[in-house]
């Protein structure tokens, strides 16, 4: 039995193309893997606090007393990391906003990137500590960006996930959403077809 974590990050709720793909994934996975456990976390509905000068102090080893706000951030960070570690398959709905990922997903990354916890520095360089995971990225875009210099989402996510130890990463694209209903419908259909294959693999 596998455990699956689905992370949504779109601010558009049910109107979101990436959220629709995430919901489709959940349906398909439940059908194909009936005994598996799926956890869905919506980072827009349950926003992660922005990392600032106060909160960053909570994520670094120190003997200093923590403020109530720092205590909350550290507890949330511990919760998110434990959740990430507990799951085998990590699904991220990551729409492109102004050429990059949503703030909601970046805030999540900022709280799980902790030296000595999710990665460590060694004589040979950084080493990720979140290992043995499979990641599936569902990324929707208004334009066509795949394999072009304007796609900052793919290299960034590969870099970050690899940095914390997740190197098995599959991308599913839904592009050209803003080009009109016909293109958007085809993009969703193509993405769902690929997702069906990914789920059954």
Swiss-Prot record:
It holds the Pfam family Flavodoxin_2. Its cofactor is FMN. The keyword Nucleotide-binding does not apply. GO terms for molecular function: electron transfer activity; FMN binding; oxidoreductase activity, acting on NAD(P)H as acceptor; oxidoreductase activity, acting on NAD(P)H, quinone or similar compound as acceptor. It is an enzyme of class 1 (oxidoreductase). Quinone reductase that provides resistance to thiol-specific stress caused by electrophilic quinones. Also exhibits azoreductase activity. Catalyzes the reductive cleavage of the azo bond in aromatic azo compounds to the corresponding amines. This is FMN-dependent NADH:quinone oxidoreductase. It comes from Yersinia enterocolitica serotype O:8 / biotype 1B (strain NCTC 13174 / 8081).
